[in-house]
Amino acid sequence: MITGYKPHELGIFNDKHPRIGIIKKALENRLRLLLDEGLEWVIISGQQGVESWSAEVVWTLKKEFPHLKYAVITPFLEQEKNWQDPKKEKYQTIIARADFVTSITKKPYEAPWQFIEKDKFIIQNTDGLLLIYDEENEGSPKYIKRLAEKFMESHDYSLLTINAYDLQMIAEEIQQQDW
């Protein structure tokens, strides 16, 4: 599974923000390493931000690695219902291009427990979590991180992170290439 921050948690308010390219490059680099180790499936829940950018990275990598697949496992039906139209359209594209789509609770939003159940289900049914997360900027990813760490106490599970330092290194690499 890949997850992390939502755009507003990173101060990103449009699709042209330069930080998105840095995040996508970091995801691509890590996914390439995982593909070399046998990665076949990427799982996301369709959230805006890191998860939607992950889907875009997978689309690019599929050209080179046609065996790579991705699934969207949402916490509830119609999660995009209250989103603005451009975000809904992007979400619909992510759903349409996915190799597998399902919803954990099979009903529209009722309460926050649906997010918790989605996180539990995905952690229990995947081999690892790739998380864009920085301890100094907690935000929403802290909950799934805690859940993964607890699961790791009794299961063979990988928690891989991309933190602020990793993103800074990517930004510097990109800057050097542009010189």
UniProtKB/Swiss-Prot annotation:
Signal sequence, renumbered to the chain: none
Gene3D superfamilies: 3.40.50.450
Cited InterPro entries: YspA (IPR010697)
Pfam families, sorted: YpsA
SUPFAM superfamilies listed in its UniProt record: MCP/YpsA-like
Family listed: Belongs to the UPF0398 family.
Name of the protein in its database record: UPF0398 protein Bsph_0756
Organism per entry: Lysinibacillus sphaericus (strain C3-41)
Lineage of the species this protein comes from: Bacteria, Bacillati, Bacillota, Bacilli, Bacillales
